[in-house]
Regions:
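Glycine- and acidic-residue-biased ligand/ion/polar-headgroup-sensing regions
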Residues: 18-34, 46, 51-57, 65, ...
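Zn2+-dependent peptidoglycan hydrolase active-site motif and core
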Residues: 281-282, 296-334, 359-364
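Polar, low-hydrophobicity, Gly/Ser/Thr/Asn/Asp-enriched low-complexity stretches outside signal peptides
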Residues: 20-25, 51, 80-108, 211-253
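Cationic-aromatic interfacial patches
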Residues: 99-208
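Sec-dependent N-terminal signal peptides
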Residues: 3-13
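Conserved, short, structured surface segments that act as functional micro-motifs
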Residues: 313-316, 339-389
Length: 395
């Protein structure tokens, strides 16, 4: 009976696909929830889990292709496929001469992020640098909220380095422990690259109760009691405007404050309009007298200049590469849809139309169809390799 059991055990092992493994540095393999001893070259099977440490690099042969796992990676083998859980994996038809050669190859492509950790309600940047042109086929930031993460090549002083940049917002109410940046690329030599990099997220917990807004008007009560109209307005902006990406960057590096006056409400404030209606404030409010000018915070193309149900008289400017600024509650619209405006041009006048208790400019910034604190764009944006090298490298 003992011999029959052993025979069945080995037969079940052989029913799984086998894969050759080579590695350098420290790696580990988990099989049936147990860590196995490693020789210099061993056989792997479906359901095995390979983890590479900071100095570990590995190669696996699967159906005639070479799968290369970079350091700090985690891969599950299943049905003749290497499923990436964390880190970076390269898929090639032609093998490297050695894993040392692959290690050097892997170091060419570098990824930087700012800030690290990411912060809920703030603007985020991810930069990919390489000596050769790369095709970024798909990229996502996985978490409770999922901003659009799309990359554009940017010019820089080092002609030997290609830089690809993505700008996005992180939802102000996000409370994740981390987000995961996932991306699929094709390199110049036709190597396929998949990566999954965890980035820590920090956030400010909301107060136990929202701050109640004083002076709620009958107009505001009517807006709150008509959720269908509010939904249609969101679908217009979020589904047809903010999701559009212009490949041209119209904006200067630094934005300007769009109005003068008293700063009446900060971005991210948790506010209650009625007993049952509370929201995070998605913009930055500047209060002033009715009819005071509102300026374009930067260069761009006007996508919306019309009266909306919730936002009142509203102007939305496309600054390119997925970045938009919006200005709500105007008493008068001046900029026209389709018009190119320059930073500092008057686009409208302060008012209290729509969901407003008094005259003010609600200034909103979005990137990747996600709002972020507008004050963050008043500082210099990163675009040159000299600036990027000072950021936190995440790969």
């Amino acid at each position: 009976m003992k011999f029959v059991f052993i025979f069945i055990f080995f037969l079940s092992i052989n029913l799984y696909s086998q894969y050759d493994l080579k590695y350098i540095g420290n790696i580990s393999v988990i099989r049936n929830n147990q860590k196995i001893n490693l020789d210099n070259a061993i056989k792997l099977y479906d359901k095995d889990i390979i983890t590479t440490e900071n100095d570990g690099y590995a190669e696996i042969k699967i159906t005639g292709k070479s799968y290369y796992i970079a350091n700090n990676g985690k891969v599950n083998l299943d049905s003749k496929n290497a499923e990436l859980k964390k880190g970076t994996i390269y898929i090639r038809n032609n093998a490297f001469k050695s894993l040392e050669e692959f290690k050097k190859y892997d170091n060419d492509l570098q990824i930087y992020a700012d800030p690290v950790p990411l912060y809920a309600g703030k603007m985020g940047n991810i930069f990919i640098t390489s000596r050769d042109e790369i095709k970024i086929k798909d990229s996502k930031l996985l978490g409770s909220s999922r901003p659009i993460v799309k990359f554009f090549e940017v010019k820089n002083s080092d002609k030997k380095i290609k830089i690809y940049k993505s700008v996005f917002g992180i939802y102000v109410g996000a409370q994740d422990e981390k987000y995961q940046f996932v991306c699929n690329m094709e390199l110049k030599d036709k190597t396929l690259l998949n990566l999954a990099i965890d980035i820590k997220l920090d956030f400010t917990p909301p107060p136990p109760k929202p701050k109640q807004i004083q002076g709620v008007t009958s107009t505001m009560t009517n807006i709150i009691s008509n959720p269908q109209k509010s939904k249609e307005e969101r679908e217009l902006l979020n589904g047809k405007i903010y999701v559009l990406y212009s490949p041209t960057n119209y904006a200067d590096k630094v934005y300007m404050m769009p109005a003068q006056g008293r700063y009446s409400s900060q971005f991210g404030a948790f506010r209650g309009y009625t007993k049952d209606y509370a929201r995070y404030h998605q913009g930055f409010d500047i209060a002033n007298s009715n009819g005071s000018p509102i300026y374009a915070a930067n260069n761009g193309v006007v996508k919306i200049s019309r009266e909306l149900f919730v936002r009142g008289n509203c102007v939305v400017i496309d600054h390119g590469e997925g970045v938009y600024s919006s200005y709500f509650h105007m008493s008068k619209l001046i900029a026209e849809e389709g018009q190119y405006v320059k930073k500092g041009d008057i686009i409208g006048l302060i008012g209290s139309t729509g969901m407003a208790t008094g005259p003010h400019c609600h200034w909103e910034m979005r990137a990747g169809n996600m709002t972020f604190d507008p004050l963050s764009v008043l500082e210099k944006n990163y675009s040159d390799i000299k600036d990027i090298k000072n950021l936190t490298r995440i790969k």
